Amino acid sequence: MDSLANAFDSSSALLNHEIAYVLGQMQDDNAVPHLIERLEDLNEDVMVRHEAAEALGAIGNRIAMGTLEKFASDEEVVVAESCEVAIDLLNWVSSKRLEYSD
């Protein structure tokens, strides 16, 4: 996971988008701070920020909720909409985890 997160230093928006996607699919809580950093970086490509939001939703760690709520009103519509979807997904994923732990 750390090797992927370190690759976020790439200047390629396409590579960074794919890294965010893979981190979301891995559903590793250790990726959350790296994805939050990508989402919060207003200089980051919109495509990367969008995928970081979706990945945070897929991971389902409630630590990301505040950031997702903050950027649900982002001026970039695709980022705002991705955050809204991610909030719903995060709620669903985290509720499923609770069901399985009971």
Give residue ranges: language-model regions.
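Amphipathic alpha-helical scaffolding segments comprising HEAT/armadillo-like alpha-solenoid repeats
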Residues: 1-9, 28-40, 61-73, 94-102
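Helix-adjacent hinge/juxtasegments
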Residues: 11-29
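Short inter-helical turns and helix N-cap capping residues of alpha-solenoid HEAT/ARM repeat scaffolds
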Residues: 11-12, 43-45, 75-76
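Core register positions within helices of long alpha-helical scaffolds
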Residues: 22-25, 55-58, 86-89, 93
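Short, glycine/charged-rich beta-strand-loop motifs at protein surfaces that mediate ligand recognition
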Residues: 41-42, 53-57
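Preference for long, well-ordered alpha-helical segments
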Residues: 63-89
